[in-house]
Swiss-Prot record:
It is found in: Membrane. The lineage of its organism: Viruses, Varidnaviria, Bamfordvirae, Preplasmiviricota, Maveriviricetes. Keywords: Membrane, Transmembrane, Transmembrane helix. This is Uncharacterized protein V15. GO terms for cellular component: membrane.
């Protein structure tokens, strides 16, 4: 009788180990397949964005038509604009006015 109980325990343990190993294998295969599918989807998304990337910058662009209202004055040292603002007269260095900085700038008339 004791041997039958040992055989029963051996076979029941073998069957339970077999079931858990099958479940573990199914779980690992499912996880691996899911990760492969996610990897493929992300690579396809990245390839789509690389191929359909908009070019926001312009290389060697030429300006065809300038509006006549824009005039570029290259030698203006802001003689039309005073260095003081308001009623109190400040030194121009405190206001950040430096005529050497404004030699080349564009302004709209």
């Amino acid at each position: 009788m004791a041997q039958i109980d040992n055989y029963d325990l051996f076979f029941s343990k073998m069957i339970s180990d077999n079931i858990t190993s099958k479940l573990f294998m199914k779980l690992t295969i499912t996880i691996i397949i899911t990760l492969v599918i996610i990897f493929i989807i992300f690579t396809l998304i990245i390839l789509y964005f690389i191929k359909n990337k908009k070019q926001d910058h312009c290389i060697n662009c030429k300006v065809e038509n300038l509006d006549s209202s824009i005039k570029i004055d290259k030698n203006n040292t802001q003689k039309d604009y005073p260095s003081n603002f308001g009623f109190v007269e400040f030194p121009s260095e405190l206001l950040g006015y430096n005529p050497k900085k404004f030699d080349n700038y564009a302004y709209i008339h």
